[in-house]
From Swiss-Prot:
Sugar-modified residues: N45
SMART domains: KAZAL
Top-level taxonomy: Eukaryota, Metazoa, Chordata, Craniata, Vertebrata
Cited InterPro entries: Bifunctional_prot_inhibitor, Kazal_dom, Kazal_dom_sf
Annotated keywords: Disulfide bond, Glycoprotein, Protease inhibitor, Repeat, Secreted, Serine protease inhibitor
Protein name: Ovomucoid
Feature type site, description Reactive bond 3: T18, E19
Gene source species: Francolinus pondicerianus
Domain notes: Avian ovomucoid consists of three homologous, tandem Kazal family inhibitory domains.
Compartments, as annotated in UniProt: Secreted
Length: 56
């Protein structure tokens, strides 16, 4: 299975939209969209990765 990844180079961003495009993080937490996920990735210093697209 190919590794799934998201480009978070443009983050963090101060404001995320409420758009529902869920992603599942390696912490087994569902993030509402790429912005929320990428902000969390930046805060985790890169330890958080994408598990898969969609809810956990």
């Amino acid at each position: 299975l190919p590794a799934v990844s998201v480009d978070c180079s443009e983050y963090p961003k101060p404001d995320c939209t409420t758009e529902e495009r869920p992603l599942c993080g390696s912490d087994n937490k569902t993030y509402g969209n790429k912005c929320n996920f990428c902000n969390a990735v930046v805060e985790s210093n890169g330890t958080l990765t994408l598990s898969h697209f969609g809810k956990c």
